[in-house]
């Protein structure tokens, strides 16, 4: 059931669509009042262990949530993935810590798809994704006659609150966080985006869209600070 909670604690200037740690909040300029909450909540779907234990030549994982969902269904040592590709440095780090080596990573799904079209060995990939995802990767691969076997590894729920009118900017970390925001809010503020895929979605609705130099929360914070020097 959709609630009607409104967050408006006075002169809040910036809102993060992901819960921030105390250390991250301390990185903002002192003049800013910053609030945060998780605009999306994820939960692992059940994937049959027999499927995960079968041989998969080319595996694509586009988020840390996908990694965690896999490990929720099957022990890492039982996964039979020959070659792993992923999106994002933090996703790569988690995969290599928990599962095994990553052959190649890119900063977004579109860039990874273009790489795979050029360099993949074979003509099929197994793509572990959310029930809510962008079309870039499967579309680009299938247009190049690369078969995509999509597995919904986790589900995404949109749970953004209604924000107060004092908000001047919102920090977004995925296209899903933007869709969540739009369920109860109007795009009248600045959209600070973690990367190009998120910015592409934001530009459909927001007049002022800004993109971090590197895809990290800290880089988005730096982007915000630049507007309040």
Model-derived features: where do they sit?
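Signature of uroporphyrinogen-III synthase
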Residues: 1-229
């Amino acid at each position: 059931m959709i609630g009607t909670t409104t967050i408006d604690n006075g002169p809040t200037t910036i809102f993060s669509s992901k819960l921030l740690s105390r250390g991250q909040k301390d990185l903002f300029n002192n003049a800013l009042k910053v609030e945060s909450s998780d605009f999306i909540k994820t939960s692992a779907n059940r994937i049959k262990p027999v499927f995960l234990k079968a041989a998969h030549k080319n595996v694509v994982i586009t988020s840390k949530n996908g990694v965690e969902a896999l490990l929720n269904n099957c022990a890492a040592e039982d996964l039979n993935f020959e070659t792993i590709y992923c999106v994002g440095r933090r996703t790569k780090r988690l995969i290599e810590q928990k599962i095994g080596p990553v052959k190649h990573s890119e900063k977004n799904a579109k860039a990874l798809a273009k790489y795979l079209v050029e360099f993949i060995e074979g003509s099929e990939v197994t793509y572990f994704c959310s029930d809510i995802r962008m079309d870039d990767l499967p579309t680009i691969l299938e247009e190049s006659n690369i078969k995509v076997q999509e597995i919904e590894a986790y589900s995404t729920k949109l749970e953004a609150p209604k924000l107060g009118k004092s908000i001047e900017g919102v920090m977004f970390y995925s296209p899903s966080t933007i869709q969540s925001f739009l369920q109860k809010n109007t795009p009248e503020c600045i959209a600070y985006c973690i990367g190009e895929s998120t910015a592409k979605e934001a530009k459909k609705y927001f007049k002022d869209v800004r993109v971090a130099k590197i895809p990290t929360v800290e880089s988005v914070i730096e982007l915000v600070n630049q507007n309040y020097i």
